[in-house]
């Protein structure tokens, strides 16, 4: 475990102190501090159908092998070897969560892995914090993601290319090239504004 600075700029030496510093940093990073009120206008209120066995089976078959395990230490390969037995057990758990509308406490646990970025390696902010969650919880998450995707795609603007299936930043780069070429042809000035939000993913309100 590498040495990092604490809040006071000191270098903690003991592993326990370093662990505590990372805990403080991640808790602060994911603490909700949004001033805009939640806007629930237009929220879809009709109920989705129960979790179906074929959804669980579809997710397990599509999950990539040789991925890092979450806190429970269970590899995805085990579920795939057990096949229908794993499908039945996971389907029962997912259905219980769906009915109770309460996420499993075990599935809430994750292992944070700090991946260094450019800059001072002693600053926690110069690390990507990757969370390893259990493969069992990924099954439920992927089912929810697939169900939500059909609604999200209808709501997103056509000009958005990032974080959409089959599209990406390359589409926007192509658009920028096209705009520049047209501006040159007509000898007009153009201005681009690029905004990079710090910790954009970490600041999303997930409530």
Over which residues does each language-model region extend?
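Extended, charged alpha/beta regions that create polyanion-binding interfaces
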Residues: 144
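Conserved catalytic palm subdomain of right-hand nucleotidyl-transferase polymerases, strongest
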Residues: 3, 63-74, 122-132, 170-207
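Surface-exposed loop/turn segments and immediately adjacent short secondary-structure elements
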Residues: 1-126, 131, 135-139
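Active-site-proximal segment of RNA-dependent polymerases
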Residues: 34-58, 102, 107-111, 150-203
């Amino acid at each position: 475990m590498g040495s990092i600075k604490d809040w006071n700029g000191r270098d903690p030496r003991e592993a326990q102190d370093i662990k505590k510093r990372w805990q403080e940093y991640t808790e602060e990073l994911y603490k909700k501090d949004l001033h805009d009120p939640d806007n629930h206008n237009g929220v879809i209120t009709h109920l989705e159908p129960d979790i179906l066995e074929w959804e669980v089976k579809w997710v397990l078959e599509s999950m990539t092998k040789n991925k890092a395990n979450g806190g429970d230490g269970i590899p995805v390969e085990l579920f795939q070897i057990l096949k229908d037995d794993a499908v039945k057990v996971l389907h029962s758990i997912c259905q219980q969560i769906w009915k109770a509308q309460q996420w499993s406490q075990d599935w809430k646990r994750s292992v944070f892995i700090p991946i260094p970025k450019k800059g001072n390696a002693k600053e926690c902010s110069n690390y990507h914090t990757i969370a390893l969650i259990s493969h069992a919880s990924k099954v439920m998450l992927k089912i929810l993601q697939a169900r939500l995707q059909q609604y999200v795609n209808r709501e997103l603007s056509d000009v958005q290319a990032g974080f959409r299936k089959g599209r990406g930043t390359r589409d926007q780069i192509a658009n920028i090239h096209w705009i520049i070429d047209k501006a040159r042809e007509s000898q007009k000035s153009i201005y681009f504004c690029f905004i990079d939000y710090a910790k954009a993913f970490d600041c999303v309100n997930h409530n």
